[in-house]
Design a protein with these regions (language model features):
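Flexible coil/turn and secondary-structure edge motifs
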Residues: 1-159
Length: 159
């Protein structure tokens, strides 16, 4: 249907954050903290990152979220560079969650249902490659769950 899944994250890469203030204003968590042993992280691109981020706040077990750009060719691009389509970045939300409180399947359900993955490079009135549907993962266990959820949701779309 569409290319949405790439393993681009490493331990040294994450969504860029403001270098002077790391406290999440809504969740009151440090957005620069690395996941602890009972936590995991994933990055979702599902349209405008502000609206997408808000969807994940209401899920119990989500520790923190942060927004930024991923999947592009330039370090620390500006909003205008990303909107130009030249850098190849997507607007994304990094989600860190407690694996003992919420399963990745619940996060994937929110991902599929909080946007329309069938609209290529747009969400509603927002148009551009930065609004594409994408998932960045860190391990093969999550990769398998992501692909399984994609197949399940694709079957529903074809009914």
């Amino acid at each position: 249907m569409f290319e949405f899944l790439k393993n681009l994250m490493t331990n040294n890469e994450s969504v860029s954050a403001n270098e002077t203030n790391f406290l999440h204003r809504i969740l009151n968590t440090d957005i620069k903290d690395e996941p602890k042993s009972q936590e995991d992280e994933i990055i979702f691109g599902c349209g405008c990152f502000w609206g997408a981020e808000k969807c994940f706040w209401k899920l119990p077990g989500v520790i923190t979220t942060s927004v930024g750009y991923a999947g592009g060719e330039k370090d620390n691009p500006t909003y205008y560079e990303v909107c130009s389509g030249i850098t190849g970045h997507a607007e994304v939300v990094k989600v860190i969650w407690n694996v003992n409180e919420i399963d990745i399947s619940d996060l994937l359900k929110m991902f599929w249902e909080c946007h329309n993955p069938t609209q290529k490079n747009r969400q509603g009135n927002d148009m551009g490659t930065q609004y594409r549907s994408t998932i960045y993962y860190k391990n093969d266990i999550n990769k398998d769950k992501i692909y399984s959820s994609k197949e399940a949701y694709q079957k529903e779309l074809y009914k």
